[in-house]
Regions:
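Helix-turn-helix repeat elements of alpha-solenoid scaffolds
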Residues: 30-46, 79-91, 119-125
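Amphipathic alpha-helices that form helix-helix packing interfaces
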Residues: 9-12, 16, 41-44, 126
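A generic tandem-repeat structural signature
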Residues: 81-120
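Terminal, low-structured helical/coil segments at or just beyond the last alpha-helical repeat
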Residues: 125-151
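Flexible helix-coil transition and linker loops at the boundaries of alpha-helical arrays
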Residues: 46-61, 93-106, 132-136, 140
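Amphipathic alpha-helical repeat scaffolds of TPR domains
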Residues: 2-30, 54-77, 101-116, 144-148
C-alpha cells in the first residue's frame, strides 16, 4: 500500500474510532465538537471512497475496506449515497475475507462487516480467531478488537 493510502486508511480508522467512542470515558460531549468530528470523518470517508487506489495486497485492500466501513458507521451524514457505498464495500469484503488469513485485521474486518449485516457465520469465524489466541498474552490491540467484537 502506498504510504499515503495507508496513512489515509489509518487516519480514517483513528478518527472514526474516536467519533464512535466520543464521551464513553465520561467526558462531556459538546455539539460543536461532535459536529466537527462527524464532518471530518465523513470528509475522510468520502475522499478514501472516491480514491481510485484500493491497495495491491489482500491486507492493504482489507485495511481500506475496514477504514471505509468504520467511517460510514461512525458518521451520521448521508447524502443518499451511503447504503450504495456500503453495499459495494461489503461486496469487496466478501472476496477479501475468503483469502485473508486469520489475524487481527481479519477479526476487525469481520466485526465491521457483522455490524452491517448481522450474518452469524461472520460472528462464528470471528469467534474462531479469538479462541485461537492465548488469552493470557493478548496485545492491547487484540484486547480492544475482542471487546469491540463482543459489544
Amino acid at each position: 500500500m502506498s504510504s499515503s493510502l495507508f496513512e489515509e486508511a489509518i487516519n480514517l480508522q483513528r478518527a472514526a474510532h474516536e467519533l464512535m467512542y466520543l464521551g464513553m470515558d465520561g467526558s462531556p460531549i459538546y455539539s460543536d465538537d461532535l459536529s466537527r468530528r462527524n464532518g471530518e470523518v465523513y470528509r475522510l470517508t468520502a475522499a478514501l471512497y472516491g480514491s481510485s487506489a484500493r491497495g495491491t495486497t489482500t491486507e492493504e485492500q482489507a485495511n481500506v475496506c475496514l477504514a471505509l466501513l468504520m467511517g460510514y458507521n461512525a458518521s451520521f451524514i448521508d447524502h443518499g449515497e451511503k447504503q450504495d457505498h456500503l453495499q459495494k464495500i461489503l461486496n469487496r469484503c466478501w472476496n477479501l475475507l475468503d483469502t485473508l488469513p486469520a489475524s487481527l485485521l481479519k477479526l476487525r474486518l469481520l466485526t465491521a462487516c457483522y455490524g452491517e449485516v448481522f450474518d452469524e457465520p461472520l460472528a462464528d469465524e470471528a469467534r474462531k480467531i479469538i479462541s485461537s489466541w492465548d488469552s493470557a498474552s493478548l496485545t492491547a490491540e487484540q484486547q480492544e478488537a475482542v471487546e469491540e467484537f463482543r459489544n
